[in-house]
Amino acid sequence: MNQEELSKKLLSPSKNSRLEKLGKSLTFACLSLIVIIVAMILIFVAQKGLSTFFVNGVNIFDFLFGATWNPSGKQFGALPMILGSFIVTILSALIATPFAIGAAVFMTEVSPKGAKILQPAIELLVGIPSVVYGFIGLQVVVPFVRTVFGGTGFGILSGIFVLFVMILPTVTFMTTDSLRAVPRHYREASLAMGATRWQTIWRVTLKAARSGIFTAVVFGMARAFGEALAIQMVVGNSAVIPTSLTTPAATLTSVLTMGIGNTVMGTVDNNVLWSLALVLLMMSLAFNRVIKLITKERGKKNYAR
């Protein structure tokens, strides 16, 4: 083999390099497709949602802060649904958080062997469809609330009970991962200094996993805020500002699921529902932003250590 043939052989692309280029091209194509799909969804929802204000002439201030939702009377105040969504989301997260932390501490710190029993039970909750949660809420939670607190049983309280069970697995598993990520020498150092196991759990382990727990709670809130079918079946779907936890109310998702099939595309009644969807989308993006900020702050703290 002369020098020229040897140079051509060495400089020609190998099979591995061609496969690497093919892999990079496929990865870039998949990434581009995902970005395009997300961008198209954002543009479509924004275009339809903003048509309410720029095409149909609905005042954006009246839409966001109006207390009356009556499409037949051309009154499109979304405040009752916005408040309803926030109330059920925040309260269900507040109730689910201590249960999730307790379950996570039990599985990681108290009885890791017990996780073999508890974890499959929690995983079972993840696989239950939303409609089943809603049906159970309709048959069990609503009659219970009606018997104990009076009224129809439909309302914020029933929605809180259903969402509490639905977001509990998410918050629990993410909290468990955060506790397991705490370095072992943190616990050993605390115990070596004379702290009890519960003092170590409370003052060291939970404190070190705090940002991860916050992330878990925000993830749970994002899940609760976007839930539609289950909450629609138990909340009562009354688009008025809730005066108590036991009175019927409505959320952004419940109004969307009930109204989107009863309107004509391009009409003000349809566009205003897309405006509700735009508000819902903005809130989802806000939740994602909060999660990124918490994760970024946790990364800085870990780097500082």
Q: What are these regions, as identified by a protein language model?
A:
Residues 1-31, 291-305:
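Transmembrane alpha-helical segments of polytopic membrane transport and secretion proteins
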Residues 9-25, 47-92, 111, 115, ...:
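Periplasmic/extracellular loop-to-transmembrane helix junction in inner-membrane transport proteins
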Residues 129, 193-194, 207:
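Glycine/proline-centered hinge or cleavage motifs at structural transition points of membrane proteins
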Residues 176-180, 184, 191, 261-305:
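C-terminal transmembrane helix and the adjacent membrane-cytosol boundary/short C-terminal tail
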Residues 231-281:
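Interhelical loop and adjacent transmembrane-helix boundary motif
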Residues 123-163:
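Generic hydrophobic transmembrane alpha-helix motif, especially the helices
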Residues 174-175, 197-235:
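Transmembrane alpha-helices
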Residues 91-122, 135, 143, 291-297:
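Transmembrane-helix boundary motif in ABC transporter permease subunits
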